[in-house]
Swiss-Prot record:
Homooctamer. Four molecules assemble into a ring, and two rings come together to give a cylinder with a hole of at least 13 a diameter. It comes from Staphylococcus aureus. Signal peptide: none annotated. The lineage of its organism: Bacteria, Bacillati, Bacillota, Bacilli, Bacillales. This is Dihydroneopterin aldolase. The gene is folB. NCBIfam families: folB, folB_dom.
């Protein structure tokens, strides 16, 4: 099954990071979420109850990203995937990618970050 729902390029300001500068100044985090979901029923019925409401998913991600500061992106991504998988039975798999576009480390790059994939069991 190849059906997906995606939320791409969500941006949130937060104070996450292992470096003290990140905790003091904060930064913008870019989050992409991809959900593996069977969309065939929603395609037939044209009813939002037969799919996953991405507005609700956005609010779940926002509450975590703009919530209590943590050290690791890995921890944020795990919390997001767990929240989505526990709230939405239709989701078979959740992929979360979090990017720091301007972390306080030397170098030239478009961003640094992590990506995880978690099956909904």
């Amino acid at each position: 099954m190849q059906d997906t729902i995606f939320l791409k390029g969500m941006r949130f300001y937060g104070y996450h990071g292992a470096l003290s500068a990140e905790n003091e100044i904060g930064q913008i985090f870019k989050v992409d979420v991809t959900l593996k979901v069977d969309l065939s029923e929603a395609g037939r019925t044209d009813n939002v109850i037969d799919t996953v409401h991405y507005g609700e998913v956005f609010e779940e991600v926002k509450s975590i990203m703009e919530g209590k500061a943590v050290n690791l992106l890995e921890h944020l991504a795990e919390r997001i995937a767990n929240r989505i998988n526990s709230q939405y039975n239709r989701v078979m798999e959740t992929k979360v990618r979090i990017t720091k576009e301007n972390p306080p480390i030397p170098g030239h790059y478009d961003g640094v970050g992590i990506e995880i994939v978690r099956e909904n069991k």
